[in-house]
């Protein structure tokens, strides 16, 4: 399948595909229905069927362009289903809001769960403003696990942008993170704290189908992502109630309860006063293009209630095995996390004292401390210095030259060129912090 090590899910699904001739069944019948009892022959179904992002799918699914959807409480359909939606990449201004003065139990510097993020969003008026509802009329209603009810729908074939499959759902289990009802709407929320490129449409569609039949008012479906002090909220609508793939973005907005004001003078002050550090031994030069995801990984490690191994990072968040290596190594390179080994010799990641201190700081200090961590390294400091002098972002060739001048060890020029993209990504993140008007 791949030169990379197989996960437990990879191995278990390969056995099931062989045992039940799943590929042949799909090619002849269009789909294959597998029961929870059959899946349990190898592993617990809850571990084998939850793939919130395309990148999390087992290798045999990825290789054959397959996906899995629950259709009853104990059955799942496997086929060439187009089940994920790419987030729209739009940069938006951040709307500042505040918690009421009397709220003492919510610490905006330490929001560690989806539930806390939702509670803070309600208390600060974010939810009411986004939904265009009156704050005093907004009521938290249905949430948690429940039955989907019965409905049928069409879903696109992954090779063809048209609804080729018809599936029947009967009492599948669904989960709603939050629902808010006002005078005009019932709004169903899916909330996440991990950053990703896509999401599983089912997380919005199945709850929408259930509650569309139960209430007379309009039902909205909303995706909320909270990371690094910023809420990103997206409302989606389904143009055709019977078409799983008919969703489209209605609107999106960013909010923060914290003061997000950072000036270029703040950034220049960090650059001017930073103390350089030598390149760390035995930690590779970063190959992790999104610095937002480096931060997000640290947040997820901080809030984890269990030992966070490399396999759990790969299984639970929007990383494949290679990206888990890249992003954990990038955070280690900056001194934000450390790697140890458990009794099974699995890598385990925890925050360093520096990482914990930064993550529990207010928004401005947190961002500037992250800048400091980056700019302590010569290549990044020199890249930002050159950008500030010219106002023009460097090219990959420019960055390779800076890496060669810094005598970065252990990588050839071709690898330097690949890793130059991370330098450009991190410098772009620093520059984008400037929101001075």
Model-derived segments and their meaning:
Residues 97-98, 175-191:
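Glycine-rich, often proline-containing surface loops adjacent to acidic residues and nearby aromatics
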